[in-house]
Amino acid sequence: VATVSLPR
């Protein structure tokens, strides 16, 4: 699966 980086 691909992981996404969430903007803070």
UniProtKB/Swiss-Prot annotation:
Coiled coil: none annotated. The keyword Oxidoreductase does not apply. The keyword Disulfide bond does not apply. It comes from the Eukaryota. Keywords: Allergen, Muscle protein. Like parvalbumins, SCPs seem to be more abundant in fast contracting muscles, but no functional relationship can be established from this distribution. The sarcoplasmic calcium-binding proteins are abundant in the muscle of arthropods, mollusks, annelids, and protochordates. This is Sarcoplasmic calcium-binding protein.
